[in-house]
């Protein structure tokens, strides 16, 4: 069985530094579980790790696809599983680091996101419905059939909303029901999972998020978005709907002021962190690490290593 170490948590909590220190001490390589860092050219807005910050530790699933290309949880699962096997077969420890809970779940739960047959006509109908009546309307259709997905997914995540509705139409079951009916096989995975969630005081986390946004602006987020536009990437693409990118696009189009854009990026990032924490709390296998209780990152790293070895 393959040992798999997972370091997750909300945006700006400090997953990158902890995961690198762990990789250094445990002879590991890092697989990014971040739905924005998979895109090329989108470096500043995704807070993508730099080559210097990697400190020589190999990183996987960063800069995987072009911003216009389709990439979903199934794509991630396929690439991540290949990377895990490759890292393990070379005698190293695969470490998953990131904040996209759905990506992480695709590895630690044994369910197939593509089990139900597809209904292209229904997908096209829902997409057209979103164009005519808005994403919020299509999202509202989930409420009566799958309240959990309704709460979990947000309206602009149209692809996943459509998928949830499609599964219900084909199977007569919500995705939530489908998963519950298959709970016995859910944990039948080829990994020995050690799953840690980093967290900290909410006020401190929000301060870090606000500061990170200011740093992004200082590094040239506006110029990055301008460059992406000049390369032909448009607001309707999934990648360009990411927090930071959509707000700057609004600013560049003259819809809002720069101050408003910065405010919205900070607010959107804080709300995203809140949603991430809600997601991670649902997994009973995860061990929470309160960073406020430790005097240094080294102490946190040593604590995680001890818990892994004592398991």
From Swiss-Prot:
Residues with site note (Interaction with substrate tRNA): 100, 123
GO biological process per UniProt: tRNA modification
Pfam families in UniProt: IPPT
Cofactor: Mg(2+)
Gene3D superfamilies noted in UniProt: 1.10.20.140, P-loop containing nucleotide triphosphate hydrolases (3.40.50.300)
UniProt region (Interaction with substrate tRNA), positions on chain: 34-37
Annotated residues for binding of substrate: 11-16
Enzyme class, UniProt record, top EC level: transferase
Residues at which ATP binds: 9-16
Function comment: Catalyzes the transfer of a dimethylallyl group onto the adenine at position 37 in tRNAs that read codons beginning with uridine, leading to the formation of N6-(dimethylallyl)adenosine (i(6)A).
Name of the protein this chain belongs to: tRNA dimethylallyltransferase
